[in-house]
Amino acid sequence: MQLATELSDWGQRVVQPDIFELIDEAEKHPPTVSTHTTFGRPRTSLHTSHGWQELQRLGIAAGVVAIPYEEANRSARLRQFMKIHLWTGSAAMVMCPSSMTDGAATLLRRHLSGTKLTEQQRSVFTEAYRRLTSRDPSEAWTSGQWMTERSGGSDVRNTETVATFVGHDAGGKDAHGMPLGPWNISGFKWFSSATDSQMAVLLAQTGKGLSAFYAPMRRTSTDGKTVEMNGVSIQRLKPKLGTRALPTAELVLDGMRAYLIGQEGEGVKEISAILNITRVHTAIGALGYWGRGLAISRAYARVRKVQGSLLEHNPAYVRALADNSLQYAAHMHFGFFTVLLLGIVEEPTSFQDSTKGVSASPRLVSSVNQAQALLRLLTPIAKCKCSRAAASGLQECMESLGGVGFLEDEQEFNVARLWRDNFANVIWEGTTEVMAADIVRVLRGRDGEKIQSAFFVWVSERLDACRNASNNLKGLDGIVQAIDAQSTELKEKWLCLSAEELRYHGRQLMEALFRVVAGVLLLDNASMGGQDKSGQTKEVKIELANRWLNPRNASGPLDCKLHAEPAALDREIALGSVHSSSGLPKHKSML
């Protein structure tokens, strides 16, 4: 009940009028940069709006970064991302720096738990970690993540920025009095978001290859009297389709002092720790935008009259809304299953303690090792599929409002902004092709056989559990058989291909994996039976799984006999059980 109350209160808070006013201000007053003084002396002065700053403070205080670092609990990530899901539609992009802050905190925590840091490194990283995970806006930091360069793009191995070791006695302090690092970095970063952050994790070449570095954004001047940029200057801010409140810049690095993270030449390995976090953020953030868009569509349907009747009573309108809601439900199950896996992997002891004496059947995951394998495989799929589906889903939401959906007046109705901002999720942290290639690397890499085995064991375990549940619930047997057939096809048709063939068919492979996992999760949800706290009846749960496996074909033959029952279920799926007809016919499997 405590979590439910927390989420309910937070959900109410993020849609209050003062929040929409802050969003509006952040949108209407995008960041600006001043690069020179009146007399032509170079300087970098970044200005962000009051709305942006206040929204960032609100998110920090709510713990959108801090929650998983405050408690060693496998469910902390679920709690964090449920709040983020509610927050994203109101955050005016402050979750972008927050996601990178989360990734940086994860990376520093990993190194602080080891024994390879020098005393100075440990001191500096400890202070940075404290600030990254703080809920106090006056103390908290955000972090940038600088990888992209003109020559390399997503291929970070073509990074041209260079780091030179200048010695531990080089001296200097950052803006907070901590010693500057022994590396000097120079180069150019073509695309860097969260330019107003207090630190950054970045990639640069050393004599031993691509390496990762920690660097503060500001340092104390040599005379100790002023604070200046730590060898960073903003060349320009990026003009963008969306994310307008977010300061995204081209950066020139000239003598940026930094600390090496990990070993030289292992930059990709180190930065992957951040990417694994930010990709989950991307998936859940996309779902947050989509969920907000659907909420607006539902609210509109309840008040908009066409030809004297509310849209919520228009069967064709409700059918389209139900189809969108089905896609949303499937992607929500997939996205939050990925979050569950992340929490288990990060807090294995908590998971093991919670499962002592509990049979495997009711658990979505049977072991930490299984969670690790599934997380590595499913994270890029979640990132890609959730962001792309949200883009399509939000387009449907815009269309459902008619001309209102294209307008950007009041922020509480502004689906256009949600669509614009979400579309960045499709591209950054890896496009579709980059994610598809990553999946092939997972399946054909060193641990590929182990990960494949873990995946199919998981599918088998869940289907067995659902078979047992189907003895008490009509309509599940056919769904179990259909998913089993999909899983077999995945194994026999796709995973027998060579790496080269898989890369060519990367999108189709990703879709096949996604549909199996989403089907299993929707089936698992249906097997729980009657109405739960979500308000979904068992008929709706079964229907969601059924429709996922058998999507309605707009060009297929019309069966008038099925019209009444699907229309009633459409209403429940789109608008909730409170709106459903009390005369809902007994459910019949549509397989």
Feature locations, PLM:
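Extended, charge-enriched "interface" segments that sit outside catalytic cores
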Residues: 1-73, 587
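Internal helix-loop-helix
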Residues: 41-134, 138-139, 193-194, 428, ...
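Extended, hydrophobic alpha-helical segments in both membrane/secreted and soluble proteins
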Residues: 128, 141-145, 159, 184-188, ...
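A glycine-rich, basic-preceded beta-loop-alpha segment at the flavin cofactor/substrate interface
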Residues: 223-227, 235, 247-278, 295-313, ...
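C-terminal helix-coil-helix/basic helical segment that borders enzyme active sites and/or dimer interfaces
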Residues: 330-383, 494-504, 527, 531-534
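Alpha-helix capping/hinge segments and adjacent helical runs
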Residues: 369-458, 553-587
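C-terminal amphipathic alpha-helical interaction region
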Residues: 446, 462-591
